[in-house]
Amino acid sequence: MRKITLAILAACLFVGSTAFAQVDDNDPGTTLVVAETKEIFVPNGFDDNDEVVVVLDGYLPDSCHKIAHHEAKYDPETGKFQVFQFARRYNVPCLPALVPYYTEVHLGMLPQGTYGIVSKGSNGEVEIGEANNAGPDDFLYAPVEHARVERDERTNKYFAIIQGRFTNTCMEWEEVKVINSGKSKELLPIIQMADRDDCQDQEIPFSWMVDLPNDDAAGRYLLHVRSLNGKSV
């Protein structure tokens, strides 16, 4: 499983899922429009046995717009996904202020290769590698369920906190690798099974702090946390 978290390394932090409730696409008195995407965040390290996810990040032009559904269409002739993030525009007086949004777009499992990602106002590219083994992951990853980014007010440095539940008493930490790839910060929380005879199935909550690269300019970055079972959350 992969955990996708969008973070702003600036004066404040923003993490979590899509920030707005979706609206009824048949809502009367509104107009369906395509929202503009400021940037497409693409995690690194997808293989052909992974569920591929990319993140659209942008702004709605004012408070009269509300995020709606999204669509992704693949063109085999160009090798590109055309992604549309729709929004509802309400015909009422509104506040002329930008409204941030971001959306996780699930593209499913893709064969090895390079795929273009095109959205209104932005484009990107996702590389799909060949899996090294027949299983869902290259390593045994911790079953991470939540991730957040915080800043140490004393040192002004950023760190991530990953949380989840071990499901066996013999699960233990081996290491957490940090891969810094520009706009994408990838965490590989690798665990191992202790060689003991008393292993039992039991849920054991964990919380682990990981230092993040702190040499980047202020802005928006994608925190990509690997987790058990080769999917995206």
Task: State where each predicted segment sits.
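Exposed, flexible binding/inhibitory loops of compact, secreted disulfide-stabilized domains
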Residues: 20-233
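Positively charged n-region of N-terminal signal peptides that target proteins for export
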Residues: 1-4
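Bacterial N-terminal signal peptides
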Residues: 7-16
